[in-house]
Amino acid sequence: FFNKKTNKRIKSDDLIGTDDLLKNLRKSDDYQVDEDSYIRARLFDMLIGDWDRHEDQWRWATFKNNGKIIYKPVPRDRDQAFSKNDGLILGFLTRAIPALKLMQVYDEDMRNVKWFNLEPYPLDMALINESVKIDWDKQVQLITTNISEKIIDEAFTFFPKEVSDESVEEIKRKLIGRLQNLQTISDQYFLEINKYGVVKGTNKDDFFEIKRHQNKT
């Protein structure tokens, strides 16, 4: 990991799986997830169209900070990026069968943000607790500022010559379009995961204070 504030690389103390992460989060509030990093990783999933983001697709790097254990996400196996599901029958099935609606053909925009995130939604609800709209907006800005058309062009030069055909230009065009639509996609998913308030605690004697506002939140 690279710390931009200190301009130095930092090493993780350990790497754990999602099951162990969730167990530790239930133990105590001394265990915390770096929500900004997780939101950024999830927005990148949506940028490249990778809908296959189940719990085993993540590892968690462990860092100690002021007596707390902070977990930073380490995404892996991004094997459904830029998906293209051809065929009339498959196209119909991915619209008609709820369990298959996450399998969306990659395009400039997202057909349905809710169904695209069907698989990672439970984990998102479990891990994104403190972040508000401005936090999501900052991560969108960070991604869109650092991924330019020039960087995209350079990245695709690493494609093997055997697969560098006309489809590469199509993917690049759609990726640039998706990048321009990322704020709208982020806004839609932020509303989706905030439809319901989920109160999360630990195995300790936690105290919750719940206030009702005039807008019924």
Q: Residue ranges of each PLM-predicted region?
A:
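Residue immediately N-terminal to the catalytic "proton-acceptor" Asp
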Residues: 51-56
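Conserved protein-kinase catalytic-loop segment immediately C-terminal to the catalytic Asp
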Residues: 57-61
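C-terminal catalytic region of ATP-dependent kinase domains
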Residues: 62-207, 215
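ATP-dependent phospho-/nucleotidyl transfer catalytic cores
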Residues: 1-50, 63-72, 84-87, 96-97, ...
